[in-house]
Amino acid sequence: MKRLCSPVVVLFLILSGCISAPDNIRDVRELRQDHASYFTGITKSEDPLPAAVQTRMDEDYNTIYFSVWHQNRPFHALPDRVYHDFKKYSLKPGYGENKKLHPPSWLKKLQNNASLNNYPNTLSRGITTRNTNLRELPTSSPHFNSSDGDSSAWPFDNLQRSSVSANTPIFVCHVSADKSWALVETSFTYGWIPVEDFASVDDEFVKIWESGRFAVIIRDQTSILDKKDRFLVRGSVGHIFPFISNASDKMQLSVAVADRHGKAVIQRGFAPADAAAVKPLRFNPVNAAKIANEMIGEPYGWGGLYGNRDCSSMTRDFFTVFGIWLPRHSEDQVKEAGTYIDLRGLSPEEKERIILQKGVPYLSLLWRKGHVMLYIGPKGGRALIFHNIWGIRTKDLQGREGRKIIGQAVITTLQPGQELTNIDSSSGSFLDNIAAMSILAPSGRENPAK
């Protein structure tokens, strides 16, 4: 005689780990992870961002992007901020790559090497020659809040401020005592990078580099080669280079490399024609879907670690292709760009109604504390979003907190993981916590919910 498990027993087995839950949340399983599939014939013909407006936005982008070459003192890396970076880690030494607490000598050595008693000691211009990482302290070693855990240990290295692509303009503020690290600013933040990852630039280089048109990479992991097919640098969506010319199979770009004296020189580089575009790429639904599909399924990368993206670097790189400037931090992206709409204090139903009514697909950002999302449009009366997300908070029967790991860029509803039996709803649902929307398209536009 066969014995059947009751629903209660099955639920207990799932919660206790005896039966594996589905690897992906329901939204990822059931929603097509293809941006092109969400456009109707109407949306394909819409022009939410007039060409003249996009051109002005791109000009503003370039002005901000190159601003570091036209300053003579730190803008982001103010002394108090730099000193604070060391002070906060003196109070919380954290854990290293070996899952052991950093000894007090770890930070002391970094402080001595930083030699901040004469900060800033350099004040010069440069350009990155490699894809690199801006670190809060002059070290590649990590700092984790705990030795293990879904949100306090790997991959959440507190010292990772942001990745920076090759050939990004920088302002060099300070060089460490051993000359191996430099504290630099980009147009969007600051941090320490290895000195071998950048080269110095002079007035002539700046004049040449800033002149003319620019190209932007539109395919991840694109190898840019020299005229002899030798590797120069790897580009991904949102990386910018001066444009030289276009051919049927290749786009010719300017690439900055370091000479033996550490000075930047310009070489000609070549990218596949379908992997690059003249910046800005015209914004329309087809192109928006094409660029978003380049990022779909990409692994989550905290602060851009391992060449991947977190939520805000994904949105930032997406909009760079279209010449739309965004800050680096998720909250700043919503509060400092576009038309801000406060959603706090509203019911989940009211929030979704406003998002559907006022949101412009692929030109609107949604924000909850620590996370930014791209609104991509309606489906069946529900709003859909595209975001690179680490996971959904969970809590088991013993009250232990955890994460249902998603760990990639996905299309979901505003309630991802709502079907999880162990979802942690103590602080409200995902939609409950969405606090604001920013519309990057010209104001005054509303979209009927479909």
Regions found by a protein language model. Give the residues of each.
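Second-shell loop/turn segments in exported
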Residues: 157, 227-228, 274-279, 297-306, ...
